Amino acid sequence: LSKNYGYNPGRYQGYSLDTPSYKFLARIDWNINENNKLNIRFSKSHDKDSSNPSSSTTPFKDSVIYPGGEDATGGKSQSGRTANAGLYFESARYYQEKNFTSFAAEWNSKWGGISNVLRATYSYQDEPRTYVGGMFPTVDILKNGSYYMGFGPDPFTEGNLRQVKTFVATDEATWSMGIQNFTAGLQFETNKATNGFGAASAGYYVFESM
């Protein structure tokens, strides 16, 4: 693979499943004067989970891709990509990332007998799938009709993404007249969602034997 196609499938054993994770939070409280206070918050987090390659063969049935009733050792068990007797390289695993960023600002002010709260928030949620190595077709090699070994990315990972952006702005004013309190306000909210999915978008090949 490395010599003929310039593709490194990764290791077949001995690789670590440890994944990075971090969280960051920052906050500023500013008392501008007696009638004005400003609060700003920022947070960011990142998680990354390592997963086995998907066992799905959508839109085909398992029996179409893996017709064998026995696994590679001759025993009765799973015959698909996650069969116990099968061997897949490091590149066949995928990582489910979870990235979240948020920003919020709040301004509290007083104007005579009126109290006002102006608030704005923005959040960005990004959950792509990533994998080891570059783009390459998914390749399954069978033995006796069951999964024997494979390399290349998980077939449902390339192009798989989910992104959500949300912005909210709110303005609320409160004033008093005697024993009565009155509140009026406005709110604006916008959301933008992006979802991507492409089964076997990099190609998927199944060989009956080595």
Question: Predicted segment positions?
Answer:
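Ligand-site clamp/hinge motif
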Residues: Y7-L25
